């Protein structure tokens, strides 16, 4: 498959908000893809490189080169070139890497160059495509969409399912089953504004602690124990205390879903970044375990002793979990059998208050009758947590790409220092409606003081209200922290930059 075809489809997908149109475009692309193309096409569509990080950013790309007139690059050829680029090391490697990139871009048309530049810098902006791509794959192969989605859930990878389905046809989907030792995509929760709203939507439910930890899926098959993150990375070797806790359980074959969390001596959660450090580093595992011990806390059972529980009601799955685990390895919860009863609603609100008092994020309200919808943000799990907001100042903005080409999109956000300067806390383009994006583009152009072709620096005058889920430590930013899941709520033109939140205010919100 020519890279030009993939680049064109990516551009068209980014330009439309219609799900049906996205599905049709991707289905056509999948029909034209050969078996050798699929392992490259799918990650490229998602804006990912199969090789992971290869050390290429905006600076590495250097000056633009004259584009080719005709498309000749294939997706597999580009993939091979990037694999070779990633392996280039040693004395003089930087020059050789730059020359490889220059040669690659010289062979690309203008449209292909734009796509490659976005792919290499993490700027492919075309919306979340996983669910749409699964439906498109079903259309391309003539398979029931529900069967494809379930296969993706069980395989943990759209890429694996696509490779088999396009080669062997719809009948091959039956081979994808829940297997101990092969992680599945985790079930995700949607947001609700309050516990009361969640109770109204779900009916009989469980209200469980929402821990600010690392999602973990644990598989045990006899003596073999493996642990996986929500992105299905194997982290077993970094977590000896998790392996020990699981090895002590009486059941010999199971799949559990839960969280890893680091607790202080007072039983309160330590900062999220400390928990994350245990997953992110392979160095000195024993020392890390001694310095930042983590504990597993589980909330679901997907399989126990040969019984597949995915399609069973949550009430049954939790009963199996309770038979397997002691209380200290399960999240705290309260069951609301009658959500209309005033005393039950009061108890649920009190449970949220107690959870927050213990230092946790909030609660997840779960439908007792719901099956486990792996890989989907379904309506049967609703998370409730306080919304944190800050009034920050826009320091700069990045030019958009894809459907945001021509717009000023990704905001650089800062908090006020005592001397009147600003400390950058992070970036976001989340939460921007089309109308707000248009307004922001026009307004920030008026404030522009410098433009390097990618980042537009602006006068620090515009205040924006930002919602975020918490703070985490970061050596990248001058205040030592950055915002987690920051998104734009609204611009505060009624406020001046002198009224924006201070670095001191931001730091005071750390747990």
UniProtKB/Swiss-Prot annotation:
It comes from the Bacteria. GO terms for biological process: cell division; DNA biosynthetic process; DNA recombination; DNA repair; DNA replication. GO terms for molecular function: ATP binding; DNA binding; DNA ligase (ATP) activity; metal ion binding. Its cofactor is Mg(2+). The active site is at residue 210. It holds the Pfam family DNA_ligase_A_N. InterPro entries: ATP-dep_DNA_ligase (IPR050191), DNA_ligae_ATP-dep_bac/arc (IPR022865), DNA_ligase_ATP-dep (IPR000977), DNA_ligase_ATP-dep_C (IPR012309), DNA_ligase_ATP-dep_cent (IPR012310), DNA_ligase_ATP-dep_CS (IPR016059), DNA_ligase_ATP-dep_N (IPR012308), DNA_ligase_N_sf (IPR036599). Its EC number is 6.5.1.1. Keywords: ATP-binding, Cell cycle, Cell division, DNA damage, DNA recombination, DNA repair, DNA replication, Ligase, Magnesium, Metal-binding, Nucleotide-binding. ATP binds at residues 208, 215, 230, 259, 299, 377, 383. It catalyses: ATP + (deoxyribonucleotide)n-3'-hydroxyl + 5'-phospho-(deoxyribonucleotide)m = (deoxyribonucleotide)n+m + AMP + diphosphate. PROSITE patterns: DNA_LIGASE_A1, DNA_LIGASE_A3. Belongs to the ATP-dependent DNA ligase family. DNA ligase that seals nicks in double-stranded DNA during DNA replication, DNA recombination and DNA repair. PANTHER family: DNA LIGASE 1/3 FAMILY MEMBER (PTHR45674), DNA LIGASE-RELATED (PTHR45674:SF13). This is Probable DNA ligase. It comes from Streptomyces griseus subsp. griseus (strain JCM 4626 / CBS 651.72 / NBRC 13350 / KCC S-0626 / ISP 5235).
């Amino acid at each position: 498959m020519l890279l030009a075809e993939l680049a064109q489809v990516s551009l068209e997908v980014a330009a439309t908000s219609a799900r049906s149109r996205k599905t049709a475009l991707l289905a056509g692309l999948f029909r034209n893809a050969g078996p050798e193309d699929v392992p490259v096409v799918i990650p490229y569509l998602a804006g990912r490189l199969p090789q992971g990080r290869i050390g290429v950013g905006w600076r590495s790309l250097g000056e633009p080169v004259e584009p080719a007139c005709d498309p000749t690059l294939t997706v597999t050829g580009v993939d091979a070139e990037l694999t070779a680029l990633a392996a280039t090391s040693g004395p003089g490697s930087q020059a050789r890497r730059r020359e490889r990139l220059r040669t690659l871009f010289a062979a690309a048309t203008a449209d292909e160059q734009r796509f490659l530049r976005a792919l290499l810098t993490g700027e492919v902006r075309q919306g979340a495509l996983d669910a749409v791509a699964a439906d498109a794959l079903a259309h391309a192969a003539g398979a029931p969409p529900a069967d494809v989605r379930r296969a993706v859930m069980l395989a943990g990878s759209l890429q694996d399912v696509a490779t088999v389905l396009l080669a062997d046809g719809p009948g091959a989907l039956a081979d994808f089953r829940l297997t101990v030792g092969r992680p599945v995509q985790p079930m995700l929760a949607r947001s609700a504004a309050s516990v009361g709203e969640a109770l109204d939507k779900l009916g009989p439910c469980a209200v469980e602690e929402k821990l600010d930890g690392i999602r973990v899926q644990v598989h045990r098959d006899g003596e073999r124990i493996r642990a996986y993150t929500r992105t299905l990375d194997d982290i077993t070797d970094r977590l000896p205390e998790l392996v020990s806790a699981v090895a002590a359980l009486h059941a010999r074959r199971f799949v559990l879903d839960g969280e890893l969390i680091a607790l202080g001596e007072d039983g309160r959660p330590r900062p999220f970044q400390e928990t994350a450090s245990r997953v992110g580093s392979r160095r000195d595992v024993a020392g890390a375990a001694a310095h930042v011990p983590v504990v597993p806390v589980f909330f679901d059972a997907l399989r126990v002793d040969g019984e597949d529980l995915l399609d069973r009601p949550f009430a049954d799955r939790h009963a199996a979990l309770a038979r397997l685990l002691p209380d200290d390895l399960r999240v705290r919860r309260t069951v609301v059998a009658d959500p209309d009863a005033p005393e039950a609603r009061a108890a649920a609100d009190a449970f949220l208050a107690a959870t927050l008092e213990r230092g946790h994020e909030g609660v997840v309200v779960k439908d007792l009758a719901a099956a486990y919808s792996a890989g989907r943000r379904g309506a049967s799990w609703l998370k409730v947590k306080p919304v944190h907001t800050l009034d920050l100042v826009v320091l700069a903005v990045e030019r958009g790409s894809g459907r945001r080409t021509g717009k000023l999109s990704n905001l650089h956000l800062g908090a006020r220092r005592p001397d009147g300067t600003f400390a950058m806390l992070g970036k976001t383009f989340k939460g921007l409606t089309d109308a707000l994006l248009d307004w922001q583009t026009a307004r920030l152009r008026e404030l522009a003081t410098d433009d390097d072709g990618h980042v537009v620096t602006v006068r620090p005058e515009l205040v924006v209200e930002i919602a975020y889920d918490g703070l985490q430590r970061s050596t990248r930013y001058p205040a030592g922290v950055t915002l987690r899941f920051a998104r734009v709520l609204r611009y505060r033109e009624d406020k001046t930059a002198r009224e924006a939140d201070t670095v001191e205010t931001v730091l005071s919100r750390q747990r």
